[in-house]
UniProtKB/Swiss-Prot annotation:
Catalyzes the oxidation of formate to carbon dioxide, with coenzyme F420 as the electron acceptor. In vitro can also use methyl viologen as electron acceptor. Dimer of an alpha (FdhA1) and a beta (FdhB1) subunit. This is F420-dependent formate dehydrogenase 1 subunit alpha. Belongs to the prokaryotic molybdopterin-containing oxidoreductase family. [4Fe-4S] cluster binds at C10, C13, C17, C45. It catalyses: oxidized coenzyme F420-(gamma-L-Glu)(n) + formate + 2 H(+) = reduced coenzyme F420-(gamma-L-Glu)(n) + CO2. The lineage of its organism: Archaea, Methanobacteriati, Methanobacteriota, Methanomada group, Methanococci. Its EC number is 1.17.98.3. Disruption phenotype: The deletion mutant cannot grow with formate and produces H(2) poorly. The fdhA1-fdhA2 double mutant is unable to utilize formate for either growth or H(2) production. Keywords: 4Fe-4S, Iron, Iron-sulfur, Metal-binding, Molybdenum, Oxidoreductase, Selenocysteine, Zinc.
Length: 674
């Protein structure tokens, strides 16, 4: 039996593990961890071990589909592109929106946003970072001048204290959690702050179980203790930051006792957390969507930055503020400018439109475009057409009834994907893309490591790489000269020309290990740790912000007495499009549930595995109860992977005004037995 082994990168979370796809007679038959990969070091999690299983599913999209007489029917590429081209040319730029994709390559995202900006002349381009880590991009950007992980994954092992807040690392980033375990074995102290007693919390030396939405109260109280106990780094504050005195004044109110009343965390635990973090020579903060998906998401992130800066935990090994990105290329999609306010490399639209007009040899709109929530809010009125590439907002976005109404209000909905997702099912035109295993390109992982992916097998039927589809559409619209690429490598060469952080990167230089951006010249070895000498702000100083606690948009009340929070489980990934088509994942669990504390369940007369109705002001879902002491009393938890019991029917679309991220992590709910 002759087997081929094709080195590539896992398509799931943002860790960026190296894997070898096993190919026999043109078919994927297995996945092996890549033994020498610097990120995962020859290990994979359960999702990564079976990441090939969805690729050859029979229900892959193989031809374009066009809606005729209410039904989606097969069509030729020429017919589908002719229809789209004709429609697009009749819309004004502000009437068209683009949802780009954290699932797709850097090359796909670059070409997609370039099409929006050069052919359609709109900055209405966004992607799911809006829903997960837009608070990171804004918060870290304002604090340090760069909205990305400050340190590397391997660097976590150099910490004396690891402070994990709003991240279930052991289930959602298992190969990063492996680093946490190794650090703990060497004596590193672990602090975990989370409303759920997760597998991550079980590894903690100190666990703080807070009420959802009270992160700032707890963080401010920890900093209050640090100031009081003189555990701050006065030298670092003086030489590397500004804004400390204002923060210090704000912190006076946040005694551990005051924060305890807001958060439910015992005052003595807050004091112990402060002393544990503050006494470490090097302390690393890890966080995820448990602090970003709030109406205060940006301020939550900036509070973590405050904590790191006042203790001098920036710019050296084992320190930093380190967001763990949820998707394989959500970092790269942001880097590529798949956002309404920035071009590639986070270059602001108003200030840099002339630069990109020159680079692309065409005029571009100088105005900031619409975000995903704004496009959906204006659908059917200002926005007539939305083009979705590799996203599934009918399951992933909050208040799904509103999303469905918005998408059905459009004159034209184009969906480009590998399966007929819930979103594709309501589309007017569906275009079949290639999966990650069927194309060349690059992903950029959570630690800013740019890595090469390699084609292992052919796409099914007439499916085509996403960037090539966009190029074909541009050619159909008479704009092919703007997309004079024949290979993914040629796309990347243009990326390097217009993206300062990628300027020194080539496919050849990436090799197997990849490179950390910024990598600005061909001699630059890359930058695993940011902000070593100074921050990337205009004056080189880190910005400390005085931040007060604010309640979530929706609090539990007499009508909806429980607090609902949502998230993921280890066996599934986002909207389940891939993992629910993986036999090994589906065999583990393939239906939704709601976690309820035993005392709450007893009061409501609910038994384990009993059907219950969970309702909020936006809708209701019938789902199985899972009685567990791991959830805080008064709080219920639902995973959002399962379309038939969609948690996002219930979630609150209220947004952080600074980044427009929705408040997935907290809303008022009630649970009733059926």
């Amino acid at each position: 039996m002759e087997l081929d082994f094709i080195h590539t990168i896992c398509p799931y979370c943002g860790t960026g593990c190296g894997v070898d796809l096993v190919v026999k007679d043109g078919t994927l038959v297995g996945t092996n961890p890549f033994k020498r990969h610097p990120v995962n070091e020859g290990k994979t999690c359960i999702k990564g071990s079976y990441c090939h299983e969805f690729v050859h599913r029979d229900d892959r999209l193989k031809t374009p589909l066009i809606r005729k007489n209410g039904e989606l029917v097969e069509a030729s590429w020429d017919e589908a592109l002719e229809l789209i081209s004709g429609k697009l040319q009749n819309y004004s730029p502000e009437e068209v929106g683009f949802f780009s994709s954290a699932r797709c390559t850097n090359e796909d995202n670059y070409v997609f946003q370039k099409f929006a900006r050069t052919v359609i002349k709109t900055n209405n381009v966004d992607h799911c970072a809006r829903l997960u880590h837009s608070a990171t991009v804004v918060g870290l950007g304002q604090a340090f001048g760069s909205g990305a992980m400050t340190n590397s994954i391997s660097d976590i092992e150099d910490a004396d204290c690891i402070f994990i807040i709003g991240s279930n690392t052991f289930e959602q980033h298992p190969l990063i959690a492996r680093r946490v375990v190794r650090a703990k074995e060497k004596g590193t102290k672990i602090i975990v702050i989370d409303p759920r007693y997760t597998p991550t919390a079980k590894q903690a030396d100190l666990y703080l179980q807070l009420l959802p939405g009270t992160n700032i109260a707890v963080l401010n109280a920890i900093m209050h203790v640090l100031v009081k106990e003189n555990l701050v780094d006065e030298e670092f504050i003086k030489n590397r930051t500004k804004g400390y005195e204002e923060l210090k004044t704000t912190l006076e109110t946040y005694t551990p006792e005051y924060a305890s009343k807001l958060s439910g965390v015992a005052p003595e635990l807050i004091v112990e957390a402060a002393k544990m973090y503050g006494s470490a020579n090097a302390a690393s903060i890890l966080y995820c969507m448990g602090i970003t998906q709030f109406t205060t998401g940006v301020n939550n992130v900036k509070s973590c930055c405050n904590l790191a800066m006042i203790t001098g935990n920036i710019g050296k090994p084992g320190t930093g503020v380190n967001p763990l990105r949820g998707q394989n290329n959500v970092q790269g999609a942001c880097d590529m400018g798949a956002l309404p306010n920035v071009f590639p490399g986070y270059q602001a639209v108003p200030a840099n439109h002339e630069k990109y007009a020159e680079a692309w040899n065409t005029c571009v709109d100088p105005n900031v475009g619409l975000s995903i929530p704004d496009m959906l809010a204006k659908a059917g009125e200002q926005v007539k057409c939305i083009y979705v590439m590799g996203e599934n907002p009918m399951v992933s976005d909050p208040d799904i009834h509103h999303v469905e109404h918005a998408l059905k209000s459009l004159d034209l909905l184009i969906v480009q994907d590998i399966f007929l997702t819930e979103t594709a099912q309501v589309a007017d035109v569906v275009l079949p893309g290639a999966s990650w295993a069927e194309k060349d390109g690059t992903f950029s992982n959570t630690e800013r490591r740019i890595q090469k992916i390699n084609k292992a097998v052919d796409s099914p039927g007439e499916a085509i790489a996403d960037w090539k589809i966009v190029k074909m559409l541009a050619e159909k619209m008479g704009q092919g000269e703007l997309f004079n690429f024949n290979t993914a490598e040629e796309v990347f060469q243009e990326i390097a020309k217009v993206t300062p952080q990628y300027a020194g990167v080539t496919y050849e230089r990436l090799g197997v290990d990849g490179l950390h951006w910024p990598c600005k010249t061909c001699e630059d070895p890359g930058t695993p740790i940011l902000h070593c000498e100074k921050c990337l702000t205009p004056d080189g100083l880190g910005n400390i912000f005085a931040i007060d606690y604010a309640d979530p948009d929706e609090m539990a009340d007499s009508e909806y007495p429980m607090t609902l929070t949502t998230g993921r489980i280890i066996f599934h990934y986002h909207t389940g499009t891939m993992t629910r088509r993986s036999k090994h994942m589906a065999d583990e669990i393939n239906e939704g549930f709601v976690e309820i504390h035993p005392e709450d369940a007893e009061k409501m007369g609910i038994k384990n595995k009993q059907k219950v109705k969970v309702s909020t002001r936006r809708g209701e879902v019938v789902v199985n109860a899972k009685i567990t002491p791991n959830i805080k009393q008064g709080v219920v938890f639902m995973p959002f992977h399962f379309a038939e019991t969609a948690a996002n029917i219930l979630t609150n679309p209220a947004q952080d005004p600074n980044c427009k991220i929705p408040e997935y992590k907290v809303c008022a709910a009630k649970v009733e037995k059926i």
